[in-house]
């Protein structure tokens, strides 16, 4: 063996193996505390923040500590307690889509607002969601695990829970502020009284084609007596009547926002809105009727704090109901009507009841005409801004001098009643919203 070969062999023997190098010699971040490393990771751009979990197991755990909001798709991940271990600091959790039995071989994805799931092509029952929901006992077990480990939970969305699951949640998560309950019923609401600090609540009773559940005056009364600190409330697919709505108005004294969606309430419920002393915003959407028989006019008192009335995708050919609604909300400064059918000139004339409207938005109101619009807004002395979009029966050629004079005084105007409107193009550069200067020309009006 030559001297050179001996030298090479000795060098190899003395060489330190790669796997014997201490981690501290190649990973300088090991000297940093978790809290300091978390602060460094938080400084990374949003596009790179998720990639840090690929570096090593420690960084994976740190990234899990940073996560605050999560939408779960696999309920077993919660039942195995891996969710709370992997993400210990969650404050916002959405369990709705995880509460369904998965269809492994289905390529059909059904979506309805916040719910999405795979649907079998041979399903013959239109209540397919109800038959594929996890049992309430399983849901409750998951809620117990979540509440036991997630003390900082602020917002939760869940479907098909029971009173027991809600009670365990309220007992451990005392800071819970927002709750969304799908497939809600009266029994479930019996346990909601334990959620003393709730500020926002969304109840979904029945959804056509998906599931059936009943929220009546009994459940609304439980809600009213238990959740007195509510600021925002949405009732979707709920039943009830004057008594249930009145109880909420009397007990929830700081309620500022009320949303009614696809209601199944008995006639006369609108009069109960008079009991809401702090209500500022009323939203009504996707309703087939407003209130066919609102009762005696003497019961219809104004909501003293009302600021905004918003109607979306509703049938407004119920004249008595519209009259009662406008009467109760006559102090609103903002009126927004979008994609509602049946809003005729006769029906819109009832809007003269509003006393101090400053902003009006009309979109997708295809029956309302220029004359019907004019007959109302000329009565509103405080009107400052207006938006008219996709209202095909409102024509530029039908604008009167009185209406054009009003337009010239508005601070803000969006005018696109249809795609053929010439007036919309003439508004550009007219100074609307800056000086309130007149922008109409004779050629526009004729």
Curated annotation (Swiss-Prot):
Ranges of residues in domain F-box: 27-73
Top-level taxon of origin: Eukaryota
Listed Gene3D superfamilies: Ribonuclease Inhibitor
Protein name: F-box protein At5g51370
């Amino acid at each position: 063996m030559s001297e050179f070969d001996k030298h090479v062999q000795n060098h190899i023997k003395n060489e330190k193996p790669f796997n014997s190098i201490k981690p501290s010699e190649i990973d300088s971040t090991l000297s940093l505390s978790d809290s300091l490393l978390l602060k460094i990771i938080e400084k990374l751009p949003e596009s790179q923040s998720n990639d840090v979990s690929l570096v090593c197991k420690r960084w994976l755990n740190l990234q899990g500590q940073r996560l605050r909001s999560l939408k779960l798709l696999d309920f077993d991940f919660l039942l195995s307690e891996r969710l709370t271990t992997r993400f210990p600091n969650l404050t916002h959790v959405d369990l709705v889509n995880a509460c369904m039995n998965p269809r492994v071989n289905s390529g059909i994805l059904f979506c309805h607002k916040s719910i999405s799931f795979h649907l079998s092509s041979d399903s013959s029952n239109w209540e397919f969601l109800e038959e594929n929901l996890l049992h309430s006992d399983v849901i409750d077990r998951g809620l117990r695990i979540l509440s036991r480990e997630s003390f900082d939970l602020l917002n939760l969305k869940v479907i098909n829970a029971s009173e027991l699951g809600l009670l365990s949640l309220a007992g451990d998560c005392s800071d819970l502020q927002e709750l969304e309950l799908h497939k809600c019923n009266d029994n479930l609401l019996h346990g909601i009284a334990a959620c003393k600090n709730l500020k926002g609540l969304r109840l979904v009773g029945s959804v056509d084609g998906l599931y059936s559940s009943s929220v009546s005056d009994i459940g609304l009364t439980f809600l009213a007596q238990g959740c007195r600190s509510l600021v925002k409330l949405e009732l979707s697919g709920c039943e009830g009547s004057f008594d249930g709505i009145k109880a909420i108005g009397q007990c929830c004294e700081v309620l500022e926002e009320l949303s009614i969606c696809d209601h199944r309430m008995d006639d006369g419920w609108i009069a109960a809105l008079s009991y809401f002393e702090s209500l500022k915003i009323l939203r009504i959407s996707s309703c087939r009727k407003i209130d066919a028989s609102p009762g005696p006019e003497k019961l219809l008192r104004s909501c003293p704090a009302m600021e905004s009335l918003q109607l979306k995708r509703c049938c407004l050919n119920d004249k008595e109901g519209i009259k009662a609604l406008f009467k109760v909300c006559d102090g609103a400064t903002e009126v927004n009507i979008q994609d509602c059918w049946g809003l005729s000139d006769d029906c819109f004339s009832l809007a003269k009841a509003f006393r101090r409207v400053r902003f009006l938005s009309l979109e997708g109101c295809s029956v309302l005409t220029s004359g019907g619009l004019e007959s109302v807004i000329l009565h509103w002395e405080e009107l400052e801004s207006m938006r008219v979009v996709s209202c095909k029966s409102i024509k530029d050629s039908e604008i009167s001098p009185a209406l054009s004079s009003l337009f010239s005084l508005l601070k803000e105007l969006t005018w696109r009643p249809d795609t053929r409107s010439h007036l919309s193009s003439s508004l550009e550069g007219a100074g609307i919203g800056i000086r309130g200067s007149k922008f109409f020309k004779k050629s526009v009006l004729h």
